[in-house]
Amino acid sequence: MKKMTKAITLGLVLMVGLLTAACPQRESIAGIEANPSKFYNKEVGIAGTVRDSYGLNIPLTQIRGGIYKVDDGTGSMWVVTQNSVPSKGTKIGVKGRVQNGVNYNGKNYGLGMVEEDRKIR
């Protein structure tokens, strides 16, 4: 019985370790802005509130996307998405790659993130 309990415990510890290793580290926007070269083209996570959002979504087509600004209380960052944009005021967590010179619709938004995944809180 003790061997089975140890095996189950070891399996759970390994599973938790793998799950946390697969998740990007959550960073403050101020930390990213203070040292952008450290995060450039790296997968990171940010969380905060959507302050602005501009999107395009044409019904009955696959055409959608846009840009939205996330504010975490330390700063704000533009996020480019190929999905529909979240509404202003939405609490959100975003995983993506930090890019310099994020462009959308012909306008440069400076340091930003290209969204890979998001969670609405």
Language-model region placement:
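Sec-dependent bacterial lipoprotein signal peptides
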Residues: 1-23
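OB-fold and OB-like single-stranded nucleic-acid-recognition modules
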Residues: 19-121
